[in-house]
Structure formats: C-alpha cells, structure tokens
UniProtKB/Swiss-Prot annotation:
Classification of source organism: Bacteria, Pseudomonadati, Pseudomonadota, Alphaproteobacteria, Hyphomicrobiales
Protein's UniProt name: Na(+)/H(+) antiporter NhaA 1
Single GO cellular component term: plasma membrane
Transmembrane segment boundaries: 23-43, 58-78, 96-116, 126-146, 155-175, 178-198, 224-244, 265-285, 298-318, 334-354, 367-387
Keywords: Antiport, Cell inner membrane, Cell membrane, Ion transport, Membrane, Sodium, Sodium transport, Transmembrane, Transmembrane helix, Transport
Amino acid sequence: MNHSPNQSRPVSIMRRFLDSESAGGVSLMVAAALALIVANSPFSQAYFDILHTHIGPLSLTDWINDALMAVFFLLVGLEIKREFLDGQLASWPNRMLPGIAAAGGVILPAIIFTAFNWHDPAKVRGWAVPSATDIAFALGVLSLLGSRVPSSLKVFLATLAILDDLAAVVIIAIFYTAEISMPYLGGAFAAAIVLFVMNRMGVMKLLPYLIGGAALWFFVLNSGVHATVAGVVTALMIPLKAAPGRPDDMTSPLHVLEHALAKPVAFIIVPIFGFANAGISFAGLDASVMRDTLTLGIMLGLFIGKQLGVFGAAWLAIKTGLAQKPLGATWIQLYGVAVLCGIGFTMSIFIGLLSFPSDLMQAETKIGVLAGSGLSAICGYILLRLVTKPKNT
C-alpha cells in the first residue's frame, strides 16, 4: 500500500523526536549519577559553592532553573503545539488513550502523596511533585529495549509524557505562583499580545519572536509567575505553517526552532539541570529520612501511584470503548510502560524546588524522586525485558 509524503511525515517526525529524547535520557542519567558522586566526594563543598555563586542578580542555580529551563519549556511548548496541530495528538481518537492515562497518572500520585502529608500544610504543598513523567529519562530506558517494544507503545509513552508536561505547566502557573507584581504582569501580557499580533499578521522570521520571548521572560520572571511559563507562551505564538494558507513543511518557524533546540536541550540544558539539582549530600542524613512522610509520599506516589493511575485509567478507557489499545501491544507490555511513567526526575525535582524553600525538605524531595524514579526505571525495564522478545530483522 502506497503512502503519500503527507501521511508518512508525522511518523518520521515522531521517530526523530523519539531518537533525540532517548539519547538525551542517557545523558541525563550520567549527569544525575555524576552529581550524586561529586556531592558526596571531597569536592562536595566546591560543588555547592559554585552553584550558589551569584552572577548578576541571580545565583548560578537560579540561572539554570529560571533561564535555561525556560528554554527547555520553550521546546516543550513547541512539541505540544506541533503534536496537537500536526502530529499524534491532532485527532480526538489519538488523544483519548494518552489523555485519559495522563489524567490518571496525575491524579492518583497526588492522592497518595496527600494521604501521607495531609496533616502538614508545609509538606502538602508538594502534592504535584510525583505527578510528572520525565520524557527523556523514560524514553531513554525504553530505548535500551530496542525492538522488543512495539513502536506504538513508544508513541503512546511520548504522547502521554507530552500531555503530562502540559499538565505540569498548568499546575506550575496556577499553584506555584508567588506574590504577583501587577506592573510586571502587565508587561508580560503586553509582550504576549505583541507575539500574538505578530503571529496573526503572518510574521515568519524567528528573530522577532525570540526578542519578544526574551522580553516576556523578563517580565514574567519579575511578576511572581514562574519564568518557565514564558517559554511555553512564546512557543504557542510561533507559527507552525511556513506561510498562511500553505501546507505545513519543515521550513516553518516552529520546525526550524524545534530542530535547532532539540539537541542542545537534550544534551546540554537537561543534563546541566540534572547535574545542578540531583546532587544530594548524604552527610548528616540518616535512615529516618526514608521514613519521613515527605520522602515516602513522593517515592510511593511515583512508583505506585503513577503505574496504577496510568494503567488503570488506560484499562478503563479501552474496556469502555473510549480508546483503543496501542497496535501490537499486549496488556503486560502496556503495564510495563505504565511503570516507566513513574520516572519523574526533571519535572518532579523542578516542582519540588518550587514547593519547598528549606534545604532539608528539598533534600527529602530529591531522595524521594530519585528512589521512586529509580524503582520505576529498574522494575519497568526488567518487566518489559522479561515479557518481550526482540524482533528478527
């Protein structure tokens, strides 16, 4: 059966996306492991001193979390827009299974975390920490299985993680906003309106959008809303079409910017974030940290809540006819992928940093995230390896 170029192009886009993200996941794993080693070595003090060094108005850690991660969210926004308008999420039938599964994977971990921490208002602020899936890390683990896993499951995991990221962006914007500065918020709205007008007027040069996005980031940073939201808003204003009324092609501003950012984000920005934020010094910490409700809520929310929430919601959607099971996938394979959804790392640590100001609570958050993500990665990988066989080529 012959396929037109337009029919095959979204698949090739997703394949390139998967390749980039899975390779980036390996880089993230290495960066996180290196951070843990350095933070517990004779170089520990130098590591933390460098991260707290001020460069202009912000510390190095703040530049990473507020500026570099805004670029990460810019790429996330570009991927979300492309997938909704021209990719795997362009039709409602394709959105149903990952959408329902993503909702289950956000709600149940939050319930489990809250059940452990409802008695402490300071801790319950972190309810969203175990609700995220790290797309790079999860696809990195999945890539280690090669041809054992049907491509439909890789697409399912990628689209679910994209919707998960969208939920995280909304959660950050609504629930993790500090005291609002109305003048700066007004400036942010003005910058967003300028970007919108440029889009409607058919401006096809990237530079004006990047300048407008930088202005938007400055205003959002000082408004009290987290600066990374600026990255997503900017992405949504960048045109997907090469010209108004023309079919989409790879020369459109969105495709050009997405292609330019994919590898720097996967191999530079995300590993830098992992190296800067995964470093936990275990000096002074004892076994009681693992029994703390904050650590347990995050760890079990990721490891238990994610897999049960994702798989349970997917099973219900398929059994009720709301969605179809991924082509060529078995129930146990779908469950294995649901286990991998408990790898929260980047977004979970990021939300944890927004939730808790104290060093101890941040350390407990990171331990919970690392434990829950590690268990999910190991168990998901072992399960999928045991129940699948590589395809003969």
